[in-house]
Amino acid sequence: MRILASALGLVLMTGCPSTSVYRTADPIEPGSYQVGGATSIGGISDEAQETRSATGQTELMLRYGVIENLDLGLKLFVPGVEVNATYRVHRGNLWSWALLPSLSWVRSKESSATVDAINAFASLGGVASRPLGDKWHIGFGVYSGYGLYWPETGGRGHGVWVGSFALADYQLRDRWHLTPELSMYKVVSGQVPVTGGAMQTGIALRVDL
């Protein structure tokens, strides 16, 4: 419990975005909804401070199918919000491909390690997925993002990161999905969200309404 509390406390203090995906290249059906929740644990490496810290995140998510190849999503996570989309660009006999754009906003609180600040992030990813039998799907993807940091004390920071992820989606009964995922990213320019990188593993439970 102490480890989990410390991890959640770190996420609350820092302005890290949610980099999880928890979905394949196939959007949900037009006119339908999907809700779910997820939890993850991982680590952040801060090269400037030469430190490594544990982290964790809890998420709630909602998706709506707009048209055959597009759905829109809303994600609430500690301590921010994200809007995203799944746009399928190819549907093959085995593999499907989709683009994954997102915008997120995070508010970090003042503490001994951080200041009161607003963080904004934009990301574009891609995922390729395919079925494995009747109940399993697997997916692999990459993404890149840009972040801005506005502290209350003045000034501005920014950063560019690249990352990758792998996931498996298991259909429980007719409407339920269990989705484990492994993801990682590296900041290649600037210092937002951290001068370094992070890795996390998590699991999501989603239901089609």
Q: What does each model-found stretch correspond to?
A:
Residues M1-C16:
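Sec-dependent bacterial lipoprotein signal peptides
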Residues G9, I28, R63-G65, D169:
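Generic structural signal for beta-strand residues in well-ordered domains
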Residues V21-Y22, E59, F165:
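A generic local structural motif
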Residues D26-I28, Q34-A38, G43, S108-L209:
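Outer-membrane beta-barrel transmembrane domain signature
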Residues T51-V106:
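Glycine- and aromatic-enriched membrane insertion/assembly motifs of diderm outer-membrane
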